[in-house]
Amino acid sequence: MSCGDVNQNQNQNCGCLADILKKILLLQRQDYDNENYKGCDKPYLGPICSTICYNTRPIMLFNCCTGAPWSFTYTINNQTSTSDVFRIEAIDDCCCTCRILYLDTATNRYLGTSEFFTINLDCVGALRCLPDTFIDLC
């Protein structure tokens, strides 16, 4: 399938990326039962899952046609800029909603914006995960 093609089996085309994004979303929501994960497959580090050090796995999404990173504009303190780093907030079939993150150069940490976008995963050719971090979501 090439970029922009329409296919009746679209959900199968984005399955691999959607599965990964669903796992990331699960981790970010800390939405698991501690009793169900006792072995190597537990999706957190440390002795108990209530110890929260990180709440975000920043991601980059790459265009399926060009390979270029997707980037979106955001405005903070009346300054408009662009970012190509995001936090997954929701996923529904082949569409995911992301929060735009930006790098605070003073602290060298990603911060969250109050700006979101929804993208069709059929338009995404690759996903890059960045190191886990804590984002203040309030």
Task: Indicate where each model-derived feature is located.
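Short glycine-rich, low-complexity segments
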Residues: 1-89, 100-138
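A short, structured loop/turn motif at beta-sheet edges
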Residues: 90-95
